A protein has these predicted regions:
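Class I SAM-dependent methyltransferase Rossmann-like catalytic core
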Residues: 1-44, 56-59
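S-adenosylmethionine/decaboxylated-SAM
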Residues: 7, 41-306
Length: 308
């Protein structure tokens, strides 16, 4: 069992507060964040959450840190990055407002709501509100102990994450990819394939979240290739296949990741303009019960590729 894998048996023992802020991640993922904060992290290096949303994941992680006797609230810092507003260019929901809907005055920022929800942890919480390209420092080389990625919804944002955060990982750093069950984000999957020689997977994904620990220094040329997306379509497909060899289902058995990753391959081809190839990969997956139930719009998009 891996070091992170030792947390899996503890998931059923975690009881989070009933009033934990709204989150788009599952209760299982929130429990795992708590366990990481409680049992694994120290605060000696950076603890970073990219995509804090309404604060549920931040709250669970911060609660674990507060319950951790090793974590020093005077010196340790949890960094929370997000736009903290709804509207064009964001993936935020109005449920992130305390009232569950946008204010009557039409305001788009839920930053004040986030601060109020996280008030118990403000002494060690640093909030970075705005576009990640502006709120992160390209010259920051301080090591990162923990990186929670729930922001890489576009290639442009993922490049920023790769250039400014992945480069700060060291052996022992822990990374969570929250959107790993999203076939439309194949850069998460083939970049993980590129990192496989240097990381240790915690175990099966916790619902949609893949967790891993860096086990060896990641060479600069690998990080550069990941950041610059310097892979051919065939190379990307091979890298995803390498991940498929390591992952079957999520920890509950409910998400068939081999099929999810196969659909991610279809999106690699789709985004490259190889629409016939994309559908040749995706078409046979229509018989998969999980994908046909949860990804109907994906099949429709791939079936109607502009070149078909």
């Amino acid at each position: 069992m891996t070091n992170l894998g030792r947390l899996y048996p503890l998931l059923d023992d975690v009881t989070l507060p009933d009033d934990i802020p709204y989150s788009q991640v599952s209760d299982w993922e929130l429990r795992f964040l708590y366990l990481l904060g409680r049992h694994r992290l120290t605060g000696e290096d950076g603890i970073v959450e990219l995509g804090s949303g309404g604060g549920g994941s931040t709250y669970a992680l911060a609660l674990g840190l507060r319950d951790n006797p090793v974590f020093d609230e005077r010196t340790g810092r949890l960094h929370a990055y997000d736009f903290f507003h709804v509207g064009k260019g964001t993936f935020a929901t109005e449920k992130f407002f305390t009232a569950g809907a946008r204010p009557v005055d039409g305001g788009t920022s839920f930053l004040a709501d986030f601060r109020a929800r996280l008030e118990p942890f403000l002494p060690f919480l640093e909030i970075h509100a705005g576009d990640i390209h502006r709120t992160s420092d390209p010259d920051d080389t301080d090591p990162i102990e923990f990186l929670h990625i729930d922001i890489a919804k576009t290639p442009r944002v993922f490049r920023c994450v790769a250039e400014r955060f992945l480069t700060r990982l060291r052996p022992g750093s822990v990374v969570l990819h929250q959107d790993f069950a999203g076939p439309r984000l194949p850069w998460l999957h083939y970049s993980t394939g590129a990192l496989l020689p240097y990381i240790e997977l915690a175990g099966p994904p916790i619902r949609s979240t893949l967790a891993f620990e860096v086990s060896r220094p990641i060479p600069a040329h690998v990080l550069k290739s990941v950041a610059e997306d310097a892979y051919t379509v065939d190379e990307k497909l091979a890298l995803i296949s390498a991940v498929q060899d390591r992952i079957d289902h999520d920890h509950t058995g409910g998400i068939p990741f081999k099929s999810v990753l196969e659909m991610a391959k279809a999106y690699v081809a789709h985004y490259a303009g190889q629409y016939e190839r994309a559908w040749s990969i995706a078409g046979p997956l229509e018989s998969d019960a999980y994908l046909s139930r949860t990804r109907a719009s994906h099949f429709e998009q791939l079936r109607k590729g502009p070149g078909r």
